[in-house]
Amino acid sequence: MATDRSVRIGLIGAGAIGEDHARRLSTVIRGADVVAVHDVDPSRAKTVATRFRDARVIPDGNSLIGDPDVDAVVVASAAPTHEAYVLAAIAARKPVFCEKPLATTAAGCLRIVEAEKAHGRRFVRVGFMRRFDPAYLGLKAELRSGAIGHPLLAHLAHRNPAVPSTLRTTDAIADSLVHEMDLVRWLFDTEIREVRAVAGRRNAKAGPDLHDPLLVLVRMATDVVVDVELSLNIGYGYHIRAEIVGENGTVALASEQPIVRRISGEERRPVAQHWKTRFAAAYDAELSEWVRDVSQGRVSGPSAWDGYAATLATDAAAESLRSDTAVAAFPGDVPTLYREP
């Protein structure tokens, strides 16, 4: 689709991330109109739809995808629904922005890859927003500059203040760890070879079905070794860390907050309390680029193959916890459709 008019978007999912994307599409991003909204909770869909003059609430996600007034689809519903909605969008030959994970299993992601290959073109962009975060872009630029030499090790941390007591370990791995699995592939421009996940002493605040925290060791195809801390009930805030160790030095994300308080013999820095604020600029950038791409009839950014490779790694992490061994996670050669020119 190449057009001078606004892209008519159908939104599936009006929960936390869907509502935030709706706000973004209505107040930040130019060239987009949300014309249809679906959510399992009709009242929530209605609340989001009222932000847009002509948006309709549609009771069925597949009907939204097939609606002739919808040019492109944003899938921000619960993770287990992603695969079916994305496949329906591909079948309808409509561009689709899907929040991570692309599907809850690597097998599901691969079915999406095969559907795109059957059409001979891309339709899917996956919401790996960290690739658009200014701090991570700076980190990658430092790597590419060669200033620290060849990378050898990396230390990452993904910390949430709290999560629902009903969250399960497999869901935490699929929904949260998937960010780091995509991030390391993107930072190092190579695939993951194997994954080892370790669960130690449990945080007393974790629900009964959640191992928290987790430590995940990732070996890249280039033998770079990455350790990832996943702490989901850390209490103090939403905190993302990354440091890369090279042959000549290190490079790391700086503090997220420019303010330092020095009071009564103590030095304090405020910490972000939510992913919405920490990655607001990244969400703006990724959706702006997607809308621009759709209006110009092209697809770029994180692909279905990226979604597959990252979820293959999270599947491996879950299997590693069960088997207490390292698990292979190499996805194979990138199909021609997904190779960058």
Curated annotation (Swiss-Prot):
It comes from the Bacteria. InterPro entries: Gfo-Idh-MocA_inositol_DH (IPR050424), Gfo/Idh/MocA-like_OxRdtase_C (IPR004104), Gfo/Idh/MocA-like_OxRdtase_N (IPR000683), MI/DCI_dehydrogenase (IPR023794), NAD(P)-bd_dom_sf (IPR036291). It comes from Acidothermus cellulolyticus (strain ATCC 43068 / DSM 8971 / 11B). Its EC number is 1.1.1.18. Keywords: NAD, Oxidoreductase. GO terms for molecular function: inositol 2-dehydrogenase (NAD+) activity; nucleotide binding. Involved in the oxidation of myo-inositol (MI) to 2-keto-myo-inositol (2KMI or 2-inosose). Coiled coil: none annotated. Disulfide bonds: none annotated. GO terms for biological process: inositol catabolic process. This is Inositol 2-dehydrogenase. It holds the Pfam family GFO_IDH_MocA. It catalyses: myo-inositol + NAD(+) = scyllo-inosose + NADH + H(+). Homotetramer. Belongs to the Gfo/Idh/MocA family. PANTHER family: INOSITOL 2-DEHYDROGENASE, PTHR43593.
